[in-house]
C-alpha cells in the first residue's frame, strides 16, 4: 500500500519500528499509525502481566506532505487498555513529557529525511507541551 505521501506503508512501518519499542503495529490501520510509551510503573509488586503504567500514546495520520499527530497522557491498565488521565504527580509528569519530547524529536528527524513534516492535527484539543528543544 502506498500512502498519499507516495511512500510505501511497509517502508514507513520499518522506519517507524527503528525508533524503538513505541510502534504498535497491530493498532496501525491504512494511513493511521499508533505509538505508545509505558514510562512509569504504577506499582512493581504485581506480576509483570498485571502491572499498570503511566505513559502516553500518539496517533499519526499520513497526509500528502506531512503527518499530523495528537497525543494523550494516561494510564495503561491491567487489561492492556489506555485511559486518558490527568497526571498529578510532578515527577511522573516530567518523565512522561521528557519521553514524549524525545520521541517527537526523533520522529520529526526521521520524517524530515523523507521530506515530510510533523504537525499537530487540526482537531487536537490538548494543551501542547513544548515538544521541540
Curated annotation (Swiss-Prot):
Q: What gene does the UniProt entry assign to this protein?
A: crl
Region annotation (Essential for activity) maps to 99-122
Q: Which InterPro entries match?
A: Tscrpt_reg_Crl (IPR009986), Tscrpt_reg_Crl_sf (IPR038208)
What coarse category fits the chief subcellular location reported for this protein?
Answer: cytoplasm
Q: Where in the cell is it found?
A: Cytoplasm
**Which GO terms fall under biological process for this protein?**
positive regulation of DNA-templated transcription
- Does the record bear Transcription in its keywords? yes
Q: Function of this protein?
A: Binds to the sigma-S subunit of RNA polymerase, activating expression of sigma-S-regulated genes. Stimulates RNA polymerase holoenzyme formation and may bind to several other sigma factors, such as sigma-70 and sigma-32.
Protein name per the record: Sigma factor-binding protein Crl
An annotated GO cellular component: cytoplasm
The Swiss-Prot or TrEMBL record describes its family as follows: Belongs to the Crl family.
Any idea which UniProt keywords this protein has? Activator, Cytoplasm, Transcription, Transcription regulation
Q: Which Pfam families match?
A: Crl
